[in-house]
Amino acid sequence: MDVSTNELAILAIVLLATGVLFYAKGTRRAPLPPGPRGIPFFGNLFQVDAMRPYPQYLKWAQKYGPVVSIKLGGQHVIVLNSSEAADELLVTRSKQYSSRESPHVAFDLVSDQQQMLFMPYGREWKIVRKNVHGLLGPGSSKQMRKMQDLESRVILHDLLCHGETSISEDFVEGPHGEVPERHWFSIIRRYTTSLMMTLMYGHRIHRIVDNPELHQVYAVVSNFTHVSQPGRYLVDVFPVLRRLPDIMAPWRAEGKKMHEWEMGFWGKLFSDSRTALLDGSGLDGFVQSYLRSRAEAGCEDLPGKGVTEDAAGWMRDKLVTYTASGIIEAGSDTTSTAMFSFVLLMLSNPDALQRAKEEMDAVVGSSRMPGWEDEDRLPWLKACIKETLRRAPPLPLGVPHKTEEDDVYNGRLIPKGSTVIGNIWAIHMDPIRYPNPTSFKPERFYHPDEKLDWASGPDTHDRDHYIFGWGRRFCSGKHIAEASLFIVLSRLIWGFDLYTGSDAKTGQARLPDVNDEATFTDGLVAAPKIYPVGFKPRSEKHAEMIKASYRDVQNDWQSMGLAGDER
């Protein structure tokens, strides 16, 4: 398609007029919260690394205060840098702040507007949320504990077998971020992915070698965290660019291609589940159960996207597919990220690690593995997990909200349509709330004389951290995530001595610096890049118990009708 000079001139006029109106409107509606000075039309766009914005946002928080106003092109952004501001706006006033500023490429194109994470607040989102909350809520999540128990035993076995593999200097990340098979990152990822896959589709990830399904999940996750980062594409911050013809909008073809790639994977899982349901084979996950209920209501065949318009509001096929994929992606990636950060921080703080071992030996000993009954008996371990989530939140900026109407906070205007970011990173780095915030200090959360709660629920008072978000957008999967963190990390501390390799030339430990931004990936999720860790059984008795437990687990899989592990 050819674009004439007149068309380009019209486009330039539209863009210029949009910028003028935007700034004129902003001037008339002052006072806005304080913030850095920008340049006409582009605002602060060139002052922020779009793929890693949270370090700059922290600097602005320290300079301008708890609420900062910035402009990213045509997008007005309000950054909330204190727990008080975030709690007041995103929780107390959640009716006004529960929508999303959906990234155009990630939401409209890649997920065809079916990704729950970025759905605007409305009927469709409420229907999806109701189904998800019923699946992941406190009561339902306890039913997952048997699976978490069994899958965590498989982790111990795999680390026992491949505990020294990850130390090799040749065992490094692939050119596109691929994690080598048998690397301890892959072993952890298999656990989190298998758990979510069983929950959604009724089948396990039962191999760590030659398992394209596991690699595909993380390829999709990696791509999604990059394309969904606010500001990743100019069209996300200049909505007027969405009107451009295809020849001038390369992101459009790129996004649609990504959608086809995703649906090639997620769509096959969905269709296989439907076939298994019709054949009466396999176990039920969420998808099979939902499709059965839908069929019993006379709505067996619902192609397309969105929900039905009747009172029942049944999710159509593509929305069911993306609801399942969203839970798998979020539950797999963020939980494994927290586990990688825990190991990094514990190795970087050997005194905290040694104290965790001593507590484990005193409470559990070597004659059994830690179990759910030990959760309140291991306050130091639990404090270490909480401090990990504070010091290295998987999503430093959470997922942005959007205000539906003008609002005023502390005398400052928050305009309708603004993107509103709960700056988890700035809140967690607040030196008043968390003295010496860059230090790893589990004693912040160590209360051995009290019955321990994770204290991370939607109740805003006395929250330890904010990684699960705020208000009506609070993460439904927190109970499953917290349970996984406890059972896996407690057993890891119980069963193994952790160590890191040394550089052959310098003799220095090959452990990345947690204070170096380059240690973590960019994009929506900040995960440690792969690093070498060895896992040595703490004794022969521990090793034999891990082996025996793994053998017992195979009998459990068989009795449950699930695939046994192939090693």
Swiss-Prot record:
Q: Where would you say this protein principally sits, based on its record? A: membrane
Function description? Cytochrome P450 monooxygenase that is able to use anthracene, carbazole, pyrene, and phenanthrene as substrates for oxidation. These multifunctional properties against a series of polycyclic aromatic hydrocarbons (PAHs) suggest that CYP231 would play important roles, at least in part, in fungal metabolic systems involved in xenobiotic detoxification.
| Residues holding heme | 475
Q: Species name for this entry?
A: Postia placenta (strain ATCC 44394 / Madison 698-R) (Brown rot fungus)
- Does the keyword Oxidoreductase belong to this entry? yes
Could you list this entry's UniProt keywords, alphabetically sorted.
Glycoprotein, Heme, Iron, Membrane, Metal-binding, Monooxygenase, Oxidoreductase, Transmembrane, Transmembrane helix
Q: Which family does it belong to?
A: Belongs to the cytochrome P450 family.
* An annotated GO cellular component: membrane
Q: In which pathway does it act?
A: Secondary metabolite biosynthesis
Highest taxon above the source species:
Eukaryota
Q: Give compartment(s).
A: Membrane
Give the protein name, as stated in the record.
Cytochrome P450 monooxygenase 231
